[in-house]
């Protein structure tokens, strides 16, 4: 079962830590966001394989935007 990882805030993508196909654990950092001069890590809610990464460095994302899919 796939799990969508979505943005909780409006932010810029500072760093994409994972790539499609990566094996990750629960709590691993997927991407780093920047908002209001603060770095905010987006963590995996489940362990699995990253099946899709929907953002790139420099993207401005809105709350609810898809960041990645873990399967």
UniProtKB/Swiss-Prot annotation:
Domain of life: Bacteria
PANTHER family: OXALOACETATE DECARBOXYLASE ALPHA CHAIN
Protein name per its UniProtKB record: Biotinylated protein TB7.3 homolog
Matches recorded under InterPro entries: Biotin_Carboxyl_Carrier/Decarb, Biotin_lipoyl, Single_hybrid_motif
Chain positions with N6-biotinyllysine modification: 37
CDD domains tied to this protein: biotinyl_domain (cd06850)
Signal peptide start and end residues: none
Keywords per UniProt: Biotin
Domain Biotinyl-binding residues, every copy: 2-71
Keyword Membrane in annotation: no
Keyword DNA repair assigned: no
Lineage of source species: Bacteria, Bacillati, Actinomycetota, Actinomycetes, Mycobacteriales
């Amino acid at each position: 079962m796939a799990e969508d990882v979505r943005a909780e805030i409006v932010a810029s993508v500072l760093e994409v830590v994972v790539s499609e196909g990566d094996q990750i654990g629960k709590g691993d950092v997927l991407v780093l966001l920047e908002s209001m001069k603060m770095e905010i890590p987006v963590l995996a809610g489940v362990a699995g394989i990253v099946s899709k990464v929907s953002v790139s460095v420099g993207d401005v994302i809105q709350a609810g935007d898809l960041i990645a899919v873990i399967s």
